[in-house]
Each structure stands twice: as structure tokens, then as C-alpha cells.
Amino acid sequence: MDLQVQIIXFLLISVTVIMSRGENVLTQSPAIMAASLGQKVTMTCSASSSVSSSYLHWYQQKSGASPKPLIHRTSNLASGVPARFSGSGSGTSYSLTISSVEAEDDATYYCQQWSGYPFGSGTKLEIKR
């Protein structure tokens, strides 16, 4: 097989992989929520098709900062994340819960299927002061 044919085949495979990545849409609910200090909150992540619990992750993005890992593999806290955060779910339905909201939790939260894939639509948590 000559080089041109190899390059074309590689490009076709790459396009197929990239297009298949976009098939599963993650929709988060609610889009915006407000909570008082100490309140328990739960936000959801719904997938258009089933996601393995080993590959569902949550990120926290504070204003002006990059997203930071929060929970990996559905329910495992990332290093340094407080125990008030927890994750659960399976199949097409996942959730992130904060058992007692603190002021520093004011951020946007994103779910993600597989590392490197697009984030879900996001939930912005606003803290009532």
C-alpha cells in the first residue's frame, strides 16, 4: 500500500472516531441553581446513551479558572476534595451532591464521559449570602 492510500485510510478512521465521540450528549440539570450556606444540593447529568460508571467524571470550574477534577469514576473523590462532595449513578443517569454547601463551592460543575471528551452542559451553583 502506498503512502497516499495509508494517509487517506488514517484520515477516514480518525474522522470516524471523532464523529462517534459526539454521539453521546450529556445534559445537566438544572442549568443554574442557588443555595444557602449549609444547604444540601444535588445536580444531575443525563446521557443520551449509556455511560460506563468507570468513565463518568465531574469537574468544578470557579470564575476565571480552569476546570479542576472533582470526582472520577462516578464516585471517587479527586485528591484534596472535601468529603461533602459525593457522586453516584449508572447507565444514563448520574448525580453530584454537596451535603452542606460552603461559600467556596460557588462555581460551575461539569460532568464528562471519558477523559478528554466534551463536558456536559454545566450547572452553575450560586451561593446566597
Curated annotation (Swiss-Prot):
It comes from the Eukaryota. The keyword Zinc does not apply. Residues 46-57 are annotated as: Complementarity-determining-1. Disulfide bonds join C45-C111. The keyword Cell cycle does not apply. Residues 80-111 are annotated as: Framework-3. Residues 119-128 are annotated as: Framework-4. InterPro entries: Ig-like_dom, Ig-like_dom_sf, Ig-like_fold, Ig_sub, Ig_V-set, IgV_Light_Chain. One of its GO terms (cellular component) is immunoglobulin complex. GO terms for biological process: adaptive immune response; immune response. Residues 1-22 form the signal peptide. Residues 112-118 are annotated as: Complementarity-determining-3. Keywords: Adaptive immunity, Disulfide bond, Immunity, Immunoglobulin, Signal. Residues 23-45 are annotated as: Framework-1. SMART domains: IG (SM00409), IGv (SM00406). This protein, in which there is a deletion of two amino acids at the V-J recombination site (after position 118), is synthesized but not secreted in cells that express and secrete the normal kappa chain S107. This is Ig kappa chain V-IV region S107B. It comes from Mus musculus (Mouse). The lineage of its organism: Eukaryota, Metazoa, Chordata, Craniata, Vertebrata.
